[in-house]
Amino acid sequence: MRCLPVFVILLLLIASTPSVDAQLKTKDDMSLASFHDNVKRILQIRTTEECCPFIVGCCSR
């Protein structure tokens, strides 16, 4: 019975904490998906720009 009030208080504290979605975004925030898209685009440009036959995996052809 002593644990019940402590358990209820902990539940109330957990429920009152702000979620990640509640935080305001600034103009500097970038989603992780767009970051991955940028990395893919840069890697695709780099592989099509130059093809080094001596490095395995450098050339996409």
Swiss-Prot record:
This protein's GO CC annotations: extracellular region
Molecular function per GO: toxin activity
Tissues of expression: Expressed by the venom duct.
Domain of life: Eukaryota
Presence of the UniProt keyword Secreted in the record: yes
Keywords attached to this entry: Disulfide bond, Neurotoxin, Secreted, Signal, Toxin
Localisation per UniProt entry: Secreted
Signal sequence, renumbered to the chain: 1-22
Record text about domains: The cysteine framework is V (CC-CC).
Name the UniProt record assigns to this protein: Conotoxin TxMRCL-04
